[in-house]
């Protein structure tokens, strides 16, 4: 077997290189490949465990390292392939997981995977697994490994995903017990080979090592080390965090976890029986034994991590993964016990499994310690920094091992209680475990963290399940979820109505009990744990990060893949043993996009929710059982091998993707983020206990949160290029915001806890920030991007839970800030998840949002106060961060763009553009830049000393007067943009400079106009921000009054800017009108404002003609449209002295009469509404214009009023009259002679009446015509003469203006015309047709009988007499008819539509009338009836 394994491993080593080339394709392999599955499954079926022993040799070689790197991706493909072959691969995989619990089991898995890899070209992943497993198996007897292998193979064949898990698990357990001891020896002995391999691996490309291999190795190592629950679970926590990053994967993964938990429970039942004596005795026997086993197991893990460490020079991954593993160890035992009670049927097996897991944990810890020590040695050889980290990590591991051993004992003791609340306790334990891992990381001592350590053990178990599911998740996450759900049901694990919610299935009672126990345990160490966790987390994170660099270059690869958010978190989580909350915060900030993806794919299933919770520290925690179930699945054979491989491959791909994108420091930060996610998920899994555990330390967490938030804010403020800000703001900031708020907010009503946990988590994050500033700077760039969103006004800033979340921008404004919010979510998640599990165990996932626990009233009050203060602080930070982004925009325009133009000019040797034109394009930007730079400095200073002086509004009050400069910029904005476009068209050189600048990273591929628009949008942003700031201030606050004043100043500036904008629009409109007129006309004048425009029909002498009217505040423009689309200017009528009125006649209700000095006419609108609008607009304009004239000439106001009155009395000749249309008069309005073809109509120029030739023979000089002689009627001529005599001595007498042949004309007048005057009775002349005091007037059709033709006449009813006129302006009626004694009857005819009515006298038909419409007919009938009665 050994020789065979060695032979297989060398091929694996070459594959890593090939896989590295195919790193990008790795994520796609998620889809199961049947061929791959077939090849991988047979390999798994083969007894490859003996081959694992030779693998240690391969690890020593650099090729092995490469293999380890690429195998993760290969494994992903294999896993996908295995997904298709669920039956065979599942059996094999389940057996392997059991084997993982034992050393033998690990070997077969590796061998199978390696074979599959060789076939599939994914040998690298398998090699990683093999490398991890080989050291264990190398030390183990080959016989034991063979036996185990046989057992695993048998179990694989026996195991069904659901039915035969128990049988296989039993076999595996026996193997695990034997292998555990052998593994200890093997791990210890094999550590040197791994170390050498690691050292040699660093030579390989870090991407290769860090790619899929590191992920695969981590996961395999964890799976292999799973026999030691503590270490294994710790690793799983990391894995689960990584896995949980993609929501889809997380959902599948959670489901798989549940399935694995169920299968694990079944396996535990059989395994407990077999291994109760073995592993349980080992766990219970002594801490030393467990420590040894743990150390051995950890050795391989650490060693694998170490080889990758040399590849990752950046020690930023300061995640105390080892500490976390230790914490997980402690948690694992209680969690297992907790799971056991949850699974009543497999309770005994669960207990055994717990003991086995504890033993495994101890072994893992020992191995990890050994490996860390070796790694430290290697790191010392490689890098002093790595050595320092590894040494500290090793020390932490040793301490953690000791503490873990103690905690294991305590957990075993406490197991019964946890068993009752298996689901809840495991979840809560996970939460506590995270805190414990923090304590371990800090190195304060695991004794302090024993309680939380126990919880972390459960977390570790949960993580293990997640790791497996994570591995499978990449490729077969959906399958895993389904299997996990079924497995949970089989194992009788308490599951809510939604099988997908694996973490939630536990009943609320169990959860509560578990939480109480966890609270008791966690309450003791939490504070100490926090401090110790902080130190341990730093040290261990450094060490693990260094190792992870070597071992989990895959994490680096996944970080590179951070561009693919979904891939970032899921797999790189494994190596993080640091504070889970810290990881959460980091993950959210760095992997905001993945969180968003998780949020979207979020399924109704609990598994999906669990994944989301992991991703978003909030909801993932709710899946307590899912974590346990995943662990159980790992331990049990429930996980299908193909599924596991697929998940691993996907996780490795994700990890690779994420790692590849980020720097080593960033990788560390991301890993810490993953850890945070895991811890958050663990916490969510164990909300009750974990919640209580962390609750006691909520205040400390808050402190950490504050410090972290400050540190992150300070670091986050450092922005990358504006482009990065814009892009990251849009992508990363928005995604995390959505995911965090959507996932976390609904579940966590306990805002207090929500806030407290983040603070707790923030401490580790601060430490992480200190260690890995690179990641933080990237986060800060995303923060600035978020800040860049400031220009797009966003709704501020509150999270649904009432916690303040400034929006994507603020969350990302600083990694610390976003982490605080996420941490708050995580803490809130624990209580809310706990309560949510209770409330929604039988509900859909929606219940997680709808059903929330009720926070404590006292805590609520405190939360409200703190919430208000925090909101004010967050808004102030948002104002500052947005100001920083805006100043950067101004710098880009004022400095960077000018520098680009100057550089281009130097290259060409001549100016690209004139300085005068460039200054105009960038008009007023220098002043705005100086103003806002000073404003930013003061804001930053205030925020640094926020605790001392919580006020910022006074700064705006002080700078308020200078903000009016924005109005000047806004006023010239359109002109400057037009100038920019013009120069780009005319000047190719300048256009090239602009294009090149826009394509530069500094400009983020955004147009220059986009940035030039920012100052225009800034004042409205100030208004919104200050308004929100004021809303959250208490009236008693010192800054309340200043904020009101500042808001008033900003509103004034905004209004002024709006007015300026309007003026600019008015100017543009005036220019447009001027350009639309034919000829050269000066329409644009100072003070002239455009009011209204439209087309009205002008009643000319004969026909209606369209005219275009433009109304200004001082004149009415009267134009005629022409075919070219232009307008011919007829006249510009001044509003001075103009009158407008509507006619009194009913027939002309749509008409409008305008009288002015220059011209008067009747206008007809299309409707009465339009007529009224014009009438109102013109009347108001006339009134306003008259007021202005009085204002400018107050001394003449009275005189003007008198003159206007005089004009009204005697306007003759002073204004142009309205000419009566020709059609409205059929006779001379003076002599009543009828007009014919030869006897023509004439209009008097003084009064506008229609007169005949004889009546208009005189001419007279009129004022409105500048005293030019014009035809006037006799009446007007006499009146003008009288006025002339009154105003004498007048130089030009009327006689002089009379016609030249005045004497002749007098003679002609004396001669009677040949035309005979028609005698008209005086009665018919008493009333004119246009009389204004009539009861009714208008046009009607009249007929003297039914068969008579209709004739059109103008009728007037006055004094109960009906007058008939030929036209509306006739002075003499054609006839008159008294209406007394007549009756009116309406004729109801279908055709006539009630428009016809009859006039009867003594029942005899006199006339038949027809109106234009029924409405007017009804009015006429009423008028007639009124006239017929006395």
Curated annotation (Swiss-Prot):
Span of domain PH: 1089-1183, 1333-1429
Give GO terms for biological process: actin cytoskeleton organization; cytoskeleton organization; filopodium assembly; regulation of cell shape; regulation of GTPase activity
Listed A to Z, the keywords are:
Cytoplasm, Cytoskeleton, Guanine-nucleotide releasing factor, Metal-binding, Phosphoprotein, Repeat, Zinc, Zinc-finger
Q: What SMART domains does this protein's entry cite?
A: FYVE, PH, RhoGEF
Question: Where are the compositionally biased (Polar residues) regions?
Answer: 334-351, 728-739
Task: State the source organism's domain of life.
Answer: Eukaryota
The protein's location, in the record's own words, is:
Cytoplasm; Cytoplasm, Cytoskeleton
GO MF terms listed in the record are: guanyl-nucleotide exchange factor activity; small GTPase binding; zinc ion binding
Q: Where does Zn(2+) 2 bind?
A: 1244, 1247, 1273, 1276
Which coarse location class applies to the principal site listed for this UniProt protein? cytoplasm
Biased composition range(s): Low complexity? 15-24
For this record, an example GO cellular component is: cytoskeleton
Zinc finger intervals, FYVE-type: 1222-1281
Ranges of residues in domain DH: 871-1060
Composition-biased stretches (Acidic residues): 831-847
Q: Which residues cross the membrane?
A: none
Residues with the Phosphoserine modification: 231, 515, 554, 605, 692, 721, 1197
Q: Which CDD domains does the UniProt entry name for this protein?
A: FYVE_FGD6, PH1_FGD6, PH2_FGD5_FGD6, RhoGEF
- Binding positions (Zn(2+) 1): 1228, 1231, 1252, 1255
Q: Name one Pfam family in it.
A: FYVE
Q: Where are the compositionally biased (Basic and acidic residues) regions?
A: 527-538, 851-868
Report the protein's function.
Answer: May activate CDC42, a member of the Ras-like family of Rho- and Rac proteins, by exchanging bound GDP for free GTP. May play a role in regulating the actin cytoskeleton and cell shape.
The protein depicted here goes by the name FYVE, RhoGEF and PH domain-containing protein 6
Q: Which gene encodes it?
A: FGD6
């Amino acid at each position: 077997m050994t020789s065979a394994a060695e032979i297989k491993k060398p091929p694996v080593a070459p594959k890593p290189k090939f896989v590295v080339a195919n790193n990008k394709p790795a994520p796609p392999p998620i889809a199961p490949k049947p061929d791959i599955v077939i090849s991988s499954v047979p390999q798994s079926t083969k007894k490859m465990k003996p081959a694992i022993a030779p693998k240690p040799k391969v690890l020593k070689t650099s090729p092995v390292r490469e293999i380890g790197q690429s195998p993760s991706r290969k494994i992903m493909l294999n896993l996908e392939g295995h997904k298709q072959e669920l039956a065979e691969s599942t059996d094999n995989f389940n057996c392997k997981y059991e084997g993982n619990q034992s050393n033998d089991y690990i070997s077969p898995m590796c061998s199978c995977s390696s074979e599959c890899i060789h076939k599939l070209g994914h040998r690298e992943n398998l090699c990683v697994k093999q490398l991890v497993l080989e050291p264990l198996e190398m030390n183990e007897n080959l016989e034991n490994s063979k036996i185990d292998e046989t057992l695993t193979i048998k179990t694989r064949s026996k195991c069904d995903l659901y039915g035969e898990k128990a049988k296989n698990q039993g076999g595996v357990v026996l193997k695990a017990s034997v292998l555990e001891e052998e593994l200890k020896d093997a791990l210890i002995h094999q550590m040197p080979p791994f170390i050498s391999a690691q050292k040699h691996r660093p030579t390989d490309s870090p991407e290769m090592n860090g790619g899929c291999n590191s992920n695969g190795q981590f996961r395999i190592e964890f799976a292999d080390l799973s026999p030691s629950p503590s270490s294994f679970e710790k690793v799983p926590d990391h894995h689960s965090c990584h896995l949980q990053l993609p929501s889809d994967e997380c959902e599948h993964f959670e489901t798989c976890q549940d399935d694995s938990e169920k299968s694990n429970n079944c396996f535990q039942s059989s395994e407990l029986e077999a291994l109760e004596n073995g592993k349980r005795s080992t766990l219970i026997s002594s801490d030393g034994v467990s420590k040894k086993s743990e150390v051995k197991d950890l050795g391989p893990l650490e060693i694998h991590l170490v080889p990758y460490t040399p590849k990752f020079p950046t020690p930023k991954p300061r995640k105390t993964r080892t500490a976390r593993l230790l914490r997980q160890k402690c948690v694992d035992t209680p969690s297992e016990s907790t799971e056991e009670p949850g699974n009543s049927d497999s309770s005994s097996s669960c207990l055994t499994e717990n003991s086995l897991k504890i033993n495994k944990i101890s072994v893992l810890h020992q191995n990890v310690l050994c490996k860390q020590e070796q790694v430290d040695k290697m790191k010392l050889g490689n890098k002093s920094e790595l050595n320092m980290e590894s040494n500290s990590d090793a020390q932490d591991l040793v301490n953690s091992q000791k503490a873990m051993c103690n905690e294991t004992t305590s957990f075993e003791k406490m197991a019964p209680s946890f068993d009752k609340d298996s689901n809840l306790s495991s979840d809560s334990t996970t939460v506590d475990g995270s805190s414990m891992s923090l304590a371990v990381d800090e190195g304060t001592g695991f004794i302090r963290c024993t309680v939380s350590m126990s919880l972390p053990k459960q977390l570790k178990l949960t993580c293990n399940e997640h790791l497996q599911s994570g591995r499978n998740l990449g490729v077969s996450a959906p399958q895993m979820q389904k299997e996990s759900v079924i497995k949970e049901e089989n194992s009788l694990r308490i599951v809510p109505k939604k099988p997908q919610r694996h973490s939630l299935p536990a009943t609320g009672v169990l959860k509560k009990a578990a939480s109480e126990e966890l609270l008791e345990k966690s309450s003791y160490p939490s504070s100490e744990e926090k401090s110790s966790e902080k130190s341990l987390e730093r040290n261990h994170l450094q060490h693990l990060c260094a190792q992870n660099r070597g071992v989990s270059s895959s994490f680096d690869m996944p970080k590179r893949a951070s561009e693919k958010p979904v891939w970032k978190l899921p797999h790189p989580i494994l190596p993080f043993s640091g504070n889970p909350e810290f990881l959460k915060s980091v993950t959210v900030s760095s992997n905001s996009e993945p969180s968003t993806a998780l949020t979207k794919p979020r399924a109704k299933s609990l598994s999906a929710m669990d994944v989301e919770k992991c991703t978003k520290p909030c909801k993932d925690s709710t899946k307590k059982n899912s974590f346990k179930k995943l662990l159980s699945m790992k331990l049990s054979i429930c996980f299908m091998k193909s599924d596991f491989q697929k998940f691993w491959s996907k996780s490795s791909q994700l990890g690779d993707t994420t790692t590849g994108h980020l720097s080593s420091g960033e990788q560390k930060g991301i890993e810490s983020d993953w850890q945070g996610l895991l811890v958050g998920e663990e916490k969510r899994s164990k909300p009750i206990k974990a919640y209580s555990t962390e609750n006691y330390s909520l205040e400390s967490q808050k402190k950490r949160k504050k410090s972290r938030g400050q540190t992150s804010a300070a670091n986050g403020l450092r922005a990358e290029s504006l482009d990065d800000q814009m892009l990251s703001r849009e992508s990363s900031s928005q995604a995390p915001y959505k995911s965090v708020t959507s996932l976390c907010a609904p579940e966590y009503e306990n805002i207090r806890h929500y806030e407290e946990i983040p603070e707790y988590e923030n401490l580790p994050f601060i430490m992480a920030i200190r260690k890995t500033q690179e990641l933080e700077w990237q986060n800060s760039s995303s923060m600035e991007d978020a800040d860049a969103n400031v220009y797009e006004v966003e709704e501020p800033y509150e999270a649904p839970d009432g916690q303040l979340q400034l929006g994507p921008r603020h969350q990302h404004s600083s990694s610390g800030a976003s982490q605080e919010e996420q941490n708050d979510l995580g803490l809130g998640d624990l209580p809310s998840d706990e309560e949510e599990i209770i409330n929604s165990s039988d509900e859909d996932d929606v219940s997680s949002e709808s059903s929330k626990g009720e926070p404590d009233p006292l805590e609520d009050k405190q939360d409200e106060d703190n919430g208000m203060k925090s909101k004010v602080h967050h808004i102030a930070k948002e104002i500052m961060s947005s100001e920083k982004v805006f100043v950067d925009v101004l710098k880009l325009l004022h400095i960077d763009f000018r520098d680009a133009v100057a550089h281009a000019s130097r290259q060409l040797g001549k100016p690209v553009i004139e300085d005068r034109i460039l200054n105009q394009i960038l008009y007023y930007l220098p002043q705005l830049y100086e103003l806002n730079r000073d404003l930013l400095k003061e804001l930053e200073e205030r925020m640094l000393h926020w605790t001392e002086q919580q006020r910022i509004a006074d700064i705006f009050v002080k700078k308020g007067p200078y903000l009016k400069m924005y109005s000047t910029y806004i006023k010239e904005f359109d002109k400057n943009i037009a100038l920019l476009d013009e120069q780009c068209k005319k000047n190719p050189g300048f256009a090239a400079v602009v294009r090149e600048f826009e394509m530069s990273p500094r400009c983020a591929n955004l147009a220059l106009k986009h940035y030039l628009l920012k100052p225009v949008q800034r004042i409205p942003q100030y208004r919104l921000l200050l308004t929100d700031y004021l809303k959250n201030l208490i009236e008693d606050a010192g800054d309340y009054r200043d904020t009101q004043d500042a808001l008033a100043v900003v509103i004034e500036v905004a209004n002024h800017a709006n007015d300026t904008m309007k003026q600019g629009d008015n100017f543009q409109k005036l220019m447009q009108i001027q350009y639309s007129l034919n000829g050269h006309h000066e329409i644009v004048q100072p003070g002239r404002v455009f009011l209204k425009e439209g087309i009205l029909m002008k009643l000319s002498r004969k026909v209606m003609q369209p005219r275009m009217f433009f109304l200004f505040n001082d004149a009415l423009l009267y134009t005629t449209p022409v075919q070219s689309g232009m307008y011919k200017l007829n006249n510009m009528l001044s509003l001075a002295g103009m009158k407008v009125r509507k006619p009194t006649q009913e027939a002309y209700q749509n008409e409008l009469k305008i009288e002015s000095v220059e011209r008067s006419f009747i206008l007809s609108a299309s409707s009465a509404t339009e007529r009224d609008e014009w009438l109102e607009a013109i009347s108001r304009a006339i009134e306003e214009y008259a007021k202005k004239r009085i204002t400018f000439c107050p001394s003449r106001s009275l005189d003007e009023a008198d003159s206007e009155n005089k004009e009204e009395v005697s306007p003759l000749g002073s204004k142009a009259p309205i000419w009566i249309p020709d059609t409205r008069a059929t006779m001379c309005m003076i002599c009543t002679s009828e007009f014919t073809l030869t006897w023509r109509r004439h209009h008097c120029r003084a009064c506008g009446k229609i007169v005949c030739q004889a009546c208009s023979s005189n001419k007279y000089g009129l004022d409105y015509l500048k005293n030019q002689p014009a035809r006037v009627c006799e009446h007007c001529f006499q009146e003008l003469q009288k006025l002339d005599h009154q105003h004498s001595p007048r130089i030009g007498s009327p006689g002089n203006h009379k016609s030249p042949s005045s004497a002749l004309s007098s003679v002609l007048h004396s001669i009677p015309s040949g035309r005979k005057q028609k005698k008209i009775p005086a009665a018919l002349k008493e009333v004119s047709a246009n009389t204004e005091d009539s009861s009714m007037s208008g046009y009607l059709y009249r007929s003297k009988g039914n068969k008579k033709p209709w004739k059109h006449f103008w009728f007037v009813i006055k004094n109960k007499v009906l007058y008939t006129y030929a036209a509306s302006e006739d002075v003499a009626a054609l006839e008159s008819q008294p209406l007394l004694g007549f009756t009116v009857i309406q004729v109801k005819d279908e055709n006539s539509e009630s428009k016809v009515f009859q006039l009867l006298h003594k029942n005899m038909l006199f006339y038949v009338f027809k109106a234009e419409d029924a409405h007017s007919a009804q009015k006429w009938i009423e008028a007639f009836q009124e006239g017929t009665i006395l």
